[in-house]
Amino acid sequence: MNKIFIQNRKDQKISVMIEKSKDQKGLVFIMHGLGGFKEQPHLEIVAEAFKEKGFTVVRFDTTNTFGESDGNYEDATLTNYYEDLEDVIKWSSTQDFYQEPFWLDGHSLGGISVVMYVENYPDKVKAVAPISPVVSGKLSKENYDPKDLAKWKKKGYKEKASASLPGVVKRLKYNEFLDRQKYDLLPQAGNLTMPVLIIVGEKDTSTPVKHQKILFKAIPGNKKELHIIKEAPHTFGEEKHLQEIKDIFLSWIHRYNN
């Protein structure tokens, strides 16, 4: 494993972790969600599956999260997450492990980011696996209680306890919500002609199953899969859920990495 810091387009540091395969069968970039970090269990388990299949795995902390990169979580936006993904891939293109087409995986805000990348650069990507992805700002808005949204707007920020980092309170500016409204995966879903694997928890209230079914329906062809993990929430942590996700990935990678 090799961990380094690179600069993004704003001259901020991004922490990148590269796990090289000795006999590389493929390359995958794995991306966390809002307020996440590259070592979260649901990312570790996906990385394990790809490594077992001979892939070089690249993970990174976006800026404005709780990892090792620059910035503050309260300033996080989908725009900044997506730009960091582009910048990590651009940097990787100068490295000896780089190959195209590569694979992409992302969770939640990372999920919409990797699909946006595919929609913008379909020829560079062999397959994409959004886990519990945000589908659009519009659908996200429908998911909010109008009273909570009004309170967030009036106050300028909202706070909640972190699920992954005990004792950490996450404060997020209202600008994140406004920025998210600019994005929607559905109009360009026709570009998703490569294998697409969508995974979502049955009890996900942030990016619920009904949102994933809308995205799934918009994707053309027959190289698409939607897996619903029973009893699972938005962020996966239970061992049985993690193992199920790993098994799904192992089968999917085997099916399409030829």
Predicted regions and their residues:
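N-terminal cap/lid segment of alpha/beta-hydrolase-fold proteins
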Residues: 1-23
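Conserved alpha/beta-hydrolase
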Residues: 41-70
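Short alpha-helix in the alpha/beta-hydrolase fold that links the catalytic acid
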Residues: 43, 194, 208-217
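Alpha/beta-hydrolase active-site loop
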Residues: 75-96
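Hydrolase active-site cap/lid region
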Residues: 120-170
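Short beta-strand/loop motif that positions the catalytic acidic residue
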Residues: 192-193, 198-200, 204
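Acidic catalytic loop of the alpha/beta-hydrolase fold
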Residues: 203-207, 235
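Catalytic histidine-centered segment of alpha/beta-hydrolase-like enzymes
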Residues: 232-245
